[in-house]
A protein has these predicted regions:
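Surface-exposed cleft-lining segments at the edges of enzyme active sites
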Residues: 89-93, 165-178
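PAPS-dependent sulfotransferase catalytic core
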Residues: 1-92, 143-173, 218-233
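The conserved 3'-phosphoadenosine-5'-phosphosulfate
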Residues: 72-81, 124, 188-233
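Conserved nucleotide-sensing/catalytic segment adjacent to the nucleotide-binding pocket
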Residues: 82-115
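Short His-Asn-centered micro-motif
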Residues: 45-47, 95-101, 120-122, 199-201
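Conserved phosphate-donor/acceptor-positioning beta-strand/loop module used by diverse small-molecule
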Residues: 111-133
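Short catalytic/ligand-binding loop motif for oxyanion handling, primarily in non-cytosolic enzymes
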Residues: 53-57, 103-106, 125-130, 136, ...
């Protein structure tokens, strides 16, 4: 692990985490909003968080594929159509995995009617457990839990990193909210004209189908599970 990575991880656990994120996002926001809107043929994997999106993004060349690029900035402005159009042109990707767009799948489909949208289905109990475990891990790794504040509070009545501190009734409400989100997402996906739905365990069996869908050759299958896409900040 290089010094820059060690420094970044250290700062993420300090009170400097949020101001540094905000400064970086403000700089990137200006860059994005100066980008002219143009047609970029990006296909998206927007199934809910923790459904294999990083694996799918990382199997393709990182020069044309990314997992959750401009992460903090996108969560702040994901309901702004002008930002999303300029962001698409700014990133100039062919494949993007950003599961948080699942919460606005219908609006996303209307904004980009010619774009293919991939949804992967994971068993809901496995998915929920993975989300909870990830939130617990991130509780130890970062000081500012912006994912919970900017996204998960739109899904549940509680921040995602609070689950193991909640009482029994509140935990039941949290689980209900999460599973309702899971159901809504795939019900919506079935109504979208350019949506494609596959089960997570089928992904590695359908590499050629994914290559055709994204019009890209899979080049990185050996290391696809590593979340090493550039630009995830």
């Amino acid at each position: 692990m290089g010094l820059a990575v060690k420094t970044k991880k250290f700062l993420a656990r300090t009170p400097l985490h949020r101001p540094l994120l905000e400064l970086n996002s403000a700089r990137r926001y200006r860059q994005v909003m100066r980008t002219p809107i143009r047609d970029v043929r990006t296909a998206y994997c927007i199934s809910p968080y923790k459904t294999g999106a990083s694996f799918i993004a990382n199997m393709f060349d990182p020069s044309v594929s990314a997992h959750e690029p401009l992460y903090h900035l996108t969560l702040k402005h994901m309901h702004n159509p002008d930002f999303l159009q300029r962001r698409k042109a700014f990133l100039d990707l062919r494949v993007e995995a950003f599961g948080h767009f699942a919460i606005m799948a219908k609006e996303f489909s209307v904004l980009f009617p010619d774009v293919d949208l991939l949804f992967t289905i994971r068993d809901p109990s496995d998915w929920l457990g993975s989300c909870l475990d990830h939130a617990a891990v991130m509780q130890q790794r970062i000081h500012y839990h912006f994912g919970g504040k900017l996204f998960w509070r739109k899904v549940t009545r509680y921040a995602s990193n609070d689950f193991y501190r909640l009482g029994d009734e509140a935990q039941c409400e949290y689980v209900t909210d999460m599973l309702n989100f899971w159901v809504r997402t795939y019900r919506t996906a079935r109504t979208l004209p350019k949506a494609h739905i596959i089960r997570l365990h089928e992904v590695e069996e359908k590499i050629e189908w994914l290559e055709d869908l994204f019009n890209q050759k899979a080049v990185n299958l050996k290391h696809a599970h590593r979340n090493n896409s550039p630009g995830r900040k």
